[in-house]
Amino acid sequence: MTHTLEDFAATCHAILAADPGPAGRQKVCSVLEDVLKDQDFVATHLGDDVPERKIIYQDKELGFCILAHVYLDARQSPPHDHGPTWAIYGQAAGETLMTDWAMVQPAAPGHPGTVRRVRDYVLKPGMAKVYDVGDLHSPRRDGPTRLIRFEGQDVTTIKRLAYREAESATA
């Protein structure tokens, strides 16, 4: 089935309007996994001309964003959460090595929190994963990757705190 951005966004809006909590986010994650299998959708929204971060839809009522991410080379992010909101990562091409982290010491403004590694896993094309409010994780991409990602709200508009791995906290 061919998906359009408009239909995809409307489906996600209906799900999140009915259930904005974790269960609703899991339903959106399942819909995203279906959309990731649609090569026409992927080609339309994740072409070579797409930057590393592009909001392709922002819901005026609920505030969630659908983003396209195209990374042409390796990238790594430090451990982070999404502040007061959530995210869903959907892998369209390439692979992302994701690490989940547990809080050792909370962060505060001007003082990074410390975290310890819990597990590593690979997001492969067609896979999606929910990161709820407060979930700490870090992605590593060793080569070109393309993702469709959700944010509960545009994270560039919110203040987030920094974290670092406990072993390197004193380095």
Regions found by a protein language model. Give the residues of each.
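Conserved short histidine dyad/triad with adjacent acidic residue
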Residues: 68-82, 122, 132-134
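N-terminal leader/capping segments at the start of a protein or of a new domain
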Residues: 1-40
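Short beta-strand His + acidic residue motifs that chelate non-heme Fe in jelly-roll/DSBH
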Residues: 77-80, 98-99, 131, 136-142, ...
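Glycine- and acidic-residue-biased ligand/ion/polar-headgroup-sensing regions
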Residues: 84-102
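Short acidic-glycine-tyrosine-enriched beta hairpin
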Residues: 88, 103-136
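A short hydrophobic beta-strand segment most commonly corresponding to one strand
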Residues: 88, 143-160
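A short beta-loop-beta micro-motif enriched in histidine and acidic residues
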Residues: 58-64, 75-88
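A short glycine-rich, His/Asp/Glu-containing loop-to-beta-strand
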Residues: 45-73
